[in-house]
Amino acid sequence: MTVKKILSLFVLIFFSASGIVFSNEKVELTSLGNKDSKVIIKVFSSLTCPHCANFHKKIFKKLKQDFIDTNIVRYEHHGFPLDLAALNGEKILNCVQNGKKRIELLNEIYDKQDDWAGGSDINNINSNLSKIAKKHGLNNDRINNCLKDENIENEILNERIMAQKKYSIESTPTIFINEKKYDGKHSYNDFKKIIEKIL
């Protein structure tokens, strides 16, 4: 089965099981940098995807230091959950209102992916995620409310479907620099050259 079919199957099964009805609730975009930057990087990734964690730890952090923190480049994280654990992670991530603090939580979610994503069941995984989230200003009530929020859940999955249709995403991470598509196999130096060429 192709990756594209697997992604579609996850959404189909989840919708069928939960009886989802789309809402008008909007998911806050996780982003850093000047919105008017000449270079905009969009990263479609799943929080449980090892390649996504590798990209975030080895490439994003260098891009942040060299280009994003100086407002040369705008970075956008677009959640593309491949499973329920990743979906719940996105829901918790969305509960952090401050953009920089949300990126800090995203950093730790990826840094500690092996610790939380390998839980024995979804309850154990949620508990592991909660321990991380508490260090970033969320309490138990807030976390539980976020996990139960069907409006946010619907919107995350809706945005994933729209991204699939618009960008034909077949694997994660998929990176777009000014709407040009790249996969996660590129190195930091590859992306650095691409950005510098645009600038």
Regions from the language model: what does each represent?
Residues 2-83, 87, 134, 154-167, ...:
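Extracytoplasmic thiol/disulfide redox context detector
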Residues 81-171, 176-189, 193-199:
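Cysteine-centric redox/oxidoreductase cores and disulfide-bonded domains
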